[in-house]
Amino acid sequence: MRQGYSPSYPLRDERITEDRLRFANLVRRQVYILLGLGLLSLTAMAVGALATWNVADPSFSHATDNPVTNALGYPGAVFSDLAMQFFGLASVPALLPLAVWSLLLMIRGYIGRIARRSLAWVGAALLFAAIASCLAVPQSWPMPIGLGGVFGDMLLRIPGFFLGGFPQGAIASAIALVLAFPALWFCFFASGIIGRGAEAVNPAMLSANRSADDEFADEDADNEAGGGFHFIGALTHLVLMTTATIRRMTGLGRRRSREDDFDDMRMVRRSAETRNAPRREPGFGAPAADDEPPFDMDDMDDGAPLAGQEWHDAPPPRARKARVEQAAPSPKPGPRAQREAQPSFLKDNGIFEMPSLHFLAEPKLVQRDPALSKDALEQNARLLEGVLEDFGVRGEIINVKPGPVVTLYELEPAPGIKSSRVIGLADDIARSMSAIAARVAVIPGRNAIGIELPNPKREMVYLREMLASRDFEQSKAKLALALGKTINGEPVIADIAKMPHVLVAGTTGSGKSVAINTMILSLLYRMTPQECRLIMIDPKMLELSVYDGIPHLLTPVVTDPKKAVVALKWTVREMEDRYRKMSKVGVRNIDGFNQRVGLAQKKGEPIARTVQTGFDRNTGEAIYETEELDLEPMPYIVVIIDEMADLMMVAGKDIEGAVQRLAQMARAAGIHVIMATQRPSVDVITGTIKANFPTRISFQVTSKIDSRTILGEQGAEQLLGQGDMLFMAGGGRIQRVHGPFVGDDEVERIVQHLKLQGVPEYLDAITEDEDDDEGGSGPAGTGNLEDSDDPYDQAVAVVLRDKKASTSYIQRRLGIGYNRAASIIERMEDEGIVGPANHAGKREILVPTGDDDF
């Protein structure tokens, strides 16, 4: 093992980011100062209106032609009249929190716990009104109510109910004294003078450099919420804050002494020397700087001057390849998130309104785990190398990539070390590193093996962060799906139009249902009902039923397994019909078809084609006619099957046949399938399904066998659950992704919004089980005859039409079992429709096959 290694990190990007944060903080502070000045101006105007209040001025409660004497004119007269009517003399102290809030905005740049302080403000105003009503009303009071206004008199009726009358005299004074303490506490709490010890720090100030303006906020943060007893100290502190602000704004400050200047210069020089000095790395062979022996006077030699001693740095350690990469920053917000951050009051009527990002939970600001610091990750890398050496695996960690859930350690094994040997040590590595699980896999295209260890503290990935990212907004994918984040924290956006189908598997509680919801919401946030339609099949009747009624659905959520078979067969017929339309237009996929139809509609010209209708009897030349095609743009269709295992148990053969045809041919027709199951066994995920679903997602499974069934290799059993997945794209490359979380309440809000945009246009033919007149072409092209009451009549029709009667032929044509087909043939023989089998196994049809139906 190499010692004394320290990775070098680029500082240019950090300096640029720091400058941007400083500039953003400067602009933000100026905005807050303007807001504070505006609020202070409004407070001063309110005080002026109350100071010049005259009961004879015209207002809402007093209609008169007298001239307005209020200093603020008619608006001031109306405001002062309403304030005195409702709060009385309590209107004046009720303005104190507004004045303090304006100062806080100018000084600190934010007001913490604004909701609680607003409630405290209302409570203080009401209590002050009650206290004012306790005072005796003088003869000069022009109002017919008490000094506390309407609210004050109403509050005093509560103790009056128990006392038998309105409080007066000593009782009123006692009530005023009792209410004084909570009124003052509410007033000081609402003003922000007390109760700042536990309030949240403004997130915008965390990343900015500390300035002189922030010193007051830091000093105030030392106060506790229980400081309500020290009113005098709080008032003194407010006066000092105001004085310091005025001095700083006017440029008047105390003169600094020479010693203070000297100390500041010394600190600046020391910090500059520390920043520019080369970093010294501790080595295992030399004591670290913190392990130096204590100073001893006996070790000093008076004969040798201290200044003459020369200190030499330790020899530079040997360079290593290992380095700790910075975690990927949060996804940059896209144009849509920026537009929704500034709400508009103008809405377009008659246009489908896409769901807003505000329906989703906002990501919480979390501090970076100290266990993911560069030093801690470097130490874990050295420890992991030691663990591998204990098991006889030589190599070195060349890269460390921390992420929101796991950290990837890239191991470059020594020559002669087999990858299978390292992969087999996954459980031992997890035990030695005290981890819940460890996943070991070869990194494609590199001479490295990835070792993924879970972080001590897991970060949650939010769907709003994914949908608001610039990667999702500017993605060129036709049907973009926000799958989650990689190990590095980079967003993963997949296009189901290129997959073209996806198989999802995972046990209960692994996050499979949440992933299905995120896929659906990804489509709903980008596609209108004219662009994408959905067919949802949910045999469990719980997961997808919440989407029932949205305009994107082609049919209500199918919960009956028998109806699910019919819906899949309708999808197959729709696929074949789309291919016939595209063949007539002469295009190869749905995008070309929609482009051709849209261009024709824009020009106002019908789509026509030339077809041959026959030959001229005289000349023998071909006759051509022009056929006009009445076509409309076709939307994408996404079929979502939440539980495949239940469908396979009810009608496995029909389901497998329909899914096979869709998976093989439906891509160009714009039909895509998302199939999920929680039982990834070979009888559910058959070889036919696996061959036609190259894109697969595996969540946590219980065994290595299930992992091999889904992905073809182990590793899914080592996942952490709760959205932790392995994403295998079409090329077979497996990528670990952490899926985003979306709650049920968020889904309900989005569904309610979509229901307000319009009603769905259902197609009844999707779930109608109509008999196939042609007998079908196999399990995917016929009705579910095995579930019919009597398929005997259909079998007779097939025999009379095709003039073939055998057990295997009936079995193939009707898609039924061999035993049932044999019973039908025996019944036909008993009724005289067919004869007995000859030596070759063929039967003669005894019933005449004329024009008359049987």
Swiss-Prot record:
Residues 247-854 are cytoplasmic. One of its GO terms (molecular function) is ATP hydrolysis activity. Residues 289-302 have a biased composition (Acidic residues). GO terms for biological process: cell division; chromosome segregation. Residues 489-708 form the FtsK domain. The keyword Transferase does not apply. SMART domains: AAA, Ftsk_gamma. The keyword Cell membrane applies. The chain crosses the membrane at residues 31-51, 87-107, 118-138, 145-165, 174-194, 226-246. Signal peptide: none annotated. Residues 252-341, 768-790 are annotated as: Disordered. Residues 264-282 have a biased composition (Basic and acidic residues). Keywords: ATP-binding, Cell cycle, Cell division, Cell inner membrane, Cell membrane, Chromosome partition, DNA-binding, Membrane, Nucleotide-binding, Transmembrane, Transmembrane helix. It is a multi-pass membrane protein. PROSITE patterns: FTSK. Pfam families: FtsK_4TM, FtsK_alpha, FtsK_gamma, FtsK_SpoIIIE. ATP binds at residues 509-514. It is found in: Cell inner membrane. Belongs to the FtsK/SpoIIIE/SftA family. Homohexamer. Forms a ring that surrounds DNA. Consists of an N-terminal domain, which is sufficient for the localization to the septal ring and is required for cell division, followed by a linker domain, and a C-terminal domain, which forms the translocation motor involved in chromosome segregation. The C-terminal domain can be further subdivided into alpha, beta and gamma subdomains. The alpha and beta subdomains multimerise to produce a hexameric ring, contain the nucleotide binding motif and form the DNA pump. This is DNA translocase FtsK. The gene is ftsK.
